[in-house]
Each structure stands twice: as structure tokens, then as C-alpha cells.
Amino acid sequence: MAKYFGTDGIRGEVANSTITAEFTQKLGNAVGSLINQKNYPKFVIVGQDTRSSGGFLKFALVSGLNAAGIDVLDLGVVPTPVVAFMTVKHRAAAGFVITASHNKFTDNGIKLFSSNGFKLDDALEEEVEDMIDGDFIYQPQFKFGSYKILANAIDEYIESIHSRFAKFVNYKGKVVVDCAHGAASHNFEALLDKFGIDYVSIASNPDGLNINVGCGATCISNIKKAVKEQKADLGISLDGDADRIIIVDENGQEIDGDGILNILAQYSDICGGTNGIVGTQMTNMSYENHYRANKIPFIRSKVGDRYVLEDLVKYGYKIGGESSGHVINLNFGTTGDGLFTAIQLLAIFSQADKPVSEFKLQGELMQQTLINVPLAKKVTREDLQKVASDVNDVEKRLGNRGRVLLRPSGTEPVLRVMVEADDKSLATNEAEYLVEKVKQKLV
């Protein structure tokens, strides 16, 4: 089991967990030393979101890298996918993002990309963890690394998207965008301006403490309200580092990551094409049935965009994502990208010329009840075995009417209990039954 890395990098409460200046400096030094060992280019890229803790953590990271002889190019406040994009474009050995994504401002973390723009695999994460716990290494003969700032890094990313989609995007509707007071603030607006979109921006005034507070992709009541007030045709909500996207239609109704994938699958020719879709264990069964009926190959990965990416590569598909709004298109990028996904959707909506609500899957979706159960420590396989018989009982009662998923969070001590069924009360009752069993046996 990983000591520091979760499903999406390293994350925790600032100063009260792993996320300290001391640890972050060791992380930078460990990765820098590993770069030297493997003879990779002695050059990395860093970026951050809008959290107040981002500055001191970034410079701690940079000091560890510089001590190991690694040059650092700082992009400033940019969305996570921009760091992945620039890492590949500028042929850096790695890319770092100081972010805790959709978490509250008191948390922070580090996402780490390899030279190909992919998140590290488990084996490489283990190597990094071993080196973190080793000696701090200084580059001999004073061959320390340099530190430079790249102003307007977002421009290269925007131009790349614009060159691909300018001929498709001619959207005439009114759009509301929620930037979660995060890394998309001003950056997303610059992208929309490039395409001539008529938009109203909310939650785009970061102060270091308001990231994700009552806004963003994990609090869509904000965008729903704004769409109705503005009489808009579309709402787009991103999270703190802009690797997630959730949209709402002209009626203020949510279309989550599953729904977005379904839209991309229907119009994949505009998005570069794909011969299959990768969802996750959380993907609603209604979409799986829909793909099967339309002869679109569909695979479920483990939850986490890194696992979606692994299966995209394994099966040779191009488009995949999660219910939570991580959407990957390997025709363009290598990680969840809320901004690029938004432009793909605007291209589709421009070409199809019908209300956003008409792009939704027709008919009732299977009903999902998801309950997060806080625990004292991270959940182990042994813990799950303690409630295996209870899960089996629920599965027997559901029969072919639904399914059960118990999933430990990869970033915090939480067990996610999900029951899906063709009836909401059935899903809720069975989920609550399992939550009680979890509390009895694991809390």
C-alpha cells in the first residue's frame, strides 16, 4: 500500500499532515534525484491553483528540485491540464501541480505528471516514496538548478485548442461559467473570449480562501441558480484545478460526467474519434445499457482518472471519464480537462443546433444513492471483508434490479457506499442498511 500517494497524487490538510514545507522540499529533492538517476532532462514544470498555501509549498518544492540540480519553469496559477500539456510540449522530465483539486482551502497537495503527460504509475510512485524517506541530496560541484517564470503560459494552451476547434465552434447561446474561485478564474474566460462565446462568469474572484466554497463542480446548486437567473442556455461548472466539469442545461438540470461522455460518444467525429468508451465502477448502468444497445464498446475502470487513462491506453480507446466530471480525450490531452471538454461540448452544441436538454440520455436513469462514511483511518481490504456478507445480502435482495459498490476514498479516510437500483427508495434503503453495518463493524 502506498505511503504518501493516493489515487490522485499526494493530498492532505496543510501543516497538520504530510503537506508541509519540509515534506514538499523532500518530495522535490526525491523526484529531482530520480530524474538524475534515470538521465532524464534536468528540467521540470510547476503550476498551482489559487490556495493561499500554494506559494510556500511551491517554493519548498522548487528548493528541493534546485538542490538536486533540476531547472524549474513556473507557470504560476494555471489549471492542472495546462501543466500536463506544457510538460509534453516543452519536453520536461516532469510536471508538478500544487493543488487539492475540489477539496476545501485548508487542504493542499501535489499532482505529479511524467514526461508523457500521464500521472505516475504505481511502480514509479513507490520509487519516489522510497527516495523521500532517504537522504536529502545536493548536486555536487554547485551545479544547482535554476528557477524561471513563464508569463502567460495559458496562451500556448488556448492557441492549441483554438487551432483544433475554431471551425466547429459557433455557439450562439448564452453561457454561465462557474470557475470555483480556482485555477480556471480568468484563464477559462480568456479561452471563451478566443472563441467569441457570450458568457457570464461567476465564482471567478479568488482570494486564497474561497476556492470551492459554495461553488464549483462539487456544488452545482450555484450554477443551477445562475443559469435560471440569467436565462442562459448552458451552465459550465469546473472545480478548483479545472480538471473536472459538470454542466447544466437550459432548465438548470445537471448533466454529470457520465452524461458528458455520452454526448462525446454520440458526436465523437467532432472530438477526433474513438472506437470505445471507458467509464468507471460508478458509471450509471443506464449508460452501459445504452452503449451496448448502440454497439459502442464500453469498459469500466477503477475510480480515478489515472485508471481511466490506463484502460484507454490498454484498449486503444480515446475518450473516457468519471461520473464526477473527469473527462479525458487522448486525441488532445492526457488527463482530465474541464476547459477542453467545455470547448468540445460547445463545438457539438454549435453543430447540432438544438437545446442542451435534448442531448441527455432519454428515459429514467438508474437511481443511485451514494453515502460517504467517515472513518478513523484509511480502509483496508481486511476492513472490507468484515462487511462482505452484508454486501452479499444486499446483492441477493437486489437481484438483477441493481448493484452495490463499496469504495474506499483514495485521498481521505472515507468509505463510499453506493447502491444503484431501478427504484430510488430501494437504493436508499439498501445503502442506509450497509452504512449501519459499516458503522457497527468499522467505526
UniProtKB/Swiss-Prot annotation:
Activated by phosphorylation. SUPFAM superfamilies: Phosphoglucomutase, C-terminal domain, Phosphoglucomutase, first 3 domains. Its EC number is 5.4.2.10. GO terms for biological process: carbohydrate metabolic process; peptidoglycan biosynthetic process; UDP-N-acetylglucosamine biosynthetic process. The modification Phosphoserine is found at S101. Its cofactor is Mg(2+). Binds 1 Mg(2+) ion per subunit. Mg(2+) binds at S101, D239, D241, D243. Belongs to the phosphohexose mutase family. Catalyzes the conversion of glucosamine-6-phosphate to glucosamine-1-phosphate. NCBIfam families: glmM, PRK10887.1. This is Phosphoglucosamine mutase. It comes from Francisella tularensis subsp. novicida (strain U112). The gene is glmM.
